[in-house]
Regions:
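Proline/glycine-enriched tight loop/beta-turn segments at coil->beta junctions
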Residues: 51-57
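Surface cap/lid and interfacial helix-loop subdomains adjacent to catalytic sites
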Residues: 134-148, 169-314, 319-340, 344, ...
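N-terminal module-boundary/linker segments of secreted carbohydrate-active enzymes
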Residues: 7-47
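Structural recognition of the beta-strand scaffold that forms the well-ordered cores
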Residues: 58-61, 105-108, 153, 182-185, ...
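Active-site-proximal beta-strand/loop segments in catalytic clefts of secreted hydrolases
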Residues: 63-65, 108-112, 157-158, 185-189, ...
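Active-site catalytic motif of lipid deacylating hydrolases and related acyltransferases
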Residues: 9-25, 62-150, 306-377
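Hydrophobic membrane-insertion alpha-helices, especially the h-region
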Residues: 1-7
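Gly/Ala-rich beta-loop-alpha elbow adjacent to hydrolase catalytic centers
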Residues: 156-164
């Protein structure tokens, strides 16, 4: 019996996450109010002039999936246990990567459960649509508070990469593209054919300093064949034409050790560092572990060496292969590249410039002096 359970453990895991009710009759969680700070994992103090912030960009981070499913199609944002997990594990590994890059905006949203990415049911697509509506509303508020001289970075992980692709489609195919430093869409497939249809104004990045472009990869360790096949063949990609599987489509793969799309092998000496942080304060900076893996793009997948530290191994638990890792192997690579691309965008001169407010200068009082009449007879 135990042998059968182990053999069919993925099917068992999937069945356990089924909410057991149609999405149409499902009592949806209350929508977040993005005017309220409690609906954000990270948001800057909007009362402080962005000109005074030590960084130059604004970064919108769409967090990965932490909710497996079971009771709900979508995560209620008042689920204190999962929200705590987001704050304790997701934030230090995936959000605070960009602390030194820009002002951070990371909304809580009614993320679709992991189960919705394991089934082809229409209910799953509707749950993902609900999640995107939250992300879109949060991004609209982000834009209202983002000064026009500040570069923008979009960072989405796993489910967040799916929604990030749609943000690019809906907002960055016109003049806003000039403010885009880069979009990091990590852990969900981005087919190259999208750049001929939905993403014509935001092409793939080709170098480490390209701006207004997209970086994307799905990274897999040795032994990850099951989830690699799922990534490249079965996950659905949303475009204006609807949801279509990733199968038989060439996928964008950016090697984060080289910052290009080549199939060259990048040795571990190029790896700037990963972290496996937990419970850190937002201001804390974890110490990255460097030179952990080599990496190579092959067939649209980023194939990794086995990491030197066990901290980056997949947790051995039911459904562990499908869950977001409690670590970010490319934390330091992303941080440094984000800074590089922001500076590159500013150097293009395409963004408006802003001078320091006159309020910060000393005011010199001018005192009238008597005017002596000119005597023309002298």
């Amino acid at each position: 019996m135990l042998g059968l359970l182990y053999l069919y453990r993925d099917d068992v895991f999937q069945n356990l996450q089924d909410p057991g009710q149609p999405f149409q009759t499902y009592d949806k969680p209350v929508a977040p109010n993005y005017l309220d700070n409690t609906s954000w994992m990270a948001r800057p103090d909007l009362q402080i002039d962005p000109f005074l912030h030590p960084t130059l960009a604004d970064v919108f981070v769409i967090v990965p999936t932490v909710y497996k499913g079971g009771e709900h199609w979508n995560l209620p944002i008042d689920d204190t246990r999962r929200i705590e997990k987001l704050n304790q594990i997701t934030r230090p590994n995936y959000v605070d990567t960009f602390n030194d890059v820009g002002r951070l905006y990371a909304p809580y949203y009614r993320q679709a459960s992991l189960y919705t990415f394991m089934t082809s049911r229409e209910d799953a697509r509707r749950a993902q649509e609900l999640a995107y509506l939250d992300v879109k509303r949060a991004f609209e508020l982000f834009l209202e508070n983002s000064a026009p001289e500040r570069p923008i970075i979009i960072a989405g992980y796993d489910q967040g990469a799916l929604h990030g692709t749609r943000i690019l489609t809906d907002f960055f195919q016109s003049t806003l593209k000039d403010r885009l430093a880069v979009a990091y869409l990590i852990g969900h497939p981005v087919p190259l054919d999208l750049f001929e249809t939905d993403l014509t104004q935001t092409p793939p990045c080709e170098t480490s300093t390209d701006v207004g472009c997209v970086v994307s990869f799905g990274a897999f360790f040795p032994g990850d064949e099951v989830i690699a096949e799922r990534f490249s063949e079965r996950l659905l990609v949303k475009s204006r034409a609807g949801y279509k599987p990733s199968a038989h489509r060439e996928l964008l793969c950016t090697n984060p050790l080289l910052w290009n799309r080549s199939q060259d092998y990048a040795p571990s000496r190029l790896h700037k560092g990963g972290v496996a942080a937990q419970g850190l304060e937002p201001e804390a900076r974890p110490a990255p572990l460097t030179k952990q893996v080599g990496a190579q793009c092959e067939g649209g997948l980023l194939l990794l060496d086995k990491p030197k530290s066990k901290l980056f191994n997949r947790p051995f638990k039911l459904g562990g292969k499908f869950r977001t890792l409690p670590s970010n192997l490319f934390y330091e690579d992303l941080r440094l590249n984000g800074i590089e691309r922001v500076n590159a965008l500013i150097d293009t001169g395409r963004l408006p410039k802003r001078v320091k407010k006159l309020d910060d200068f000393k005011v010199i009082e001018l005192i009238d002096s008597p005017v002596s009449p000119i005597n023309k007879d002298e």
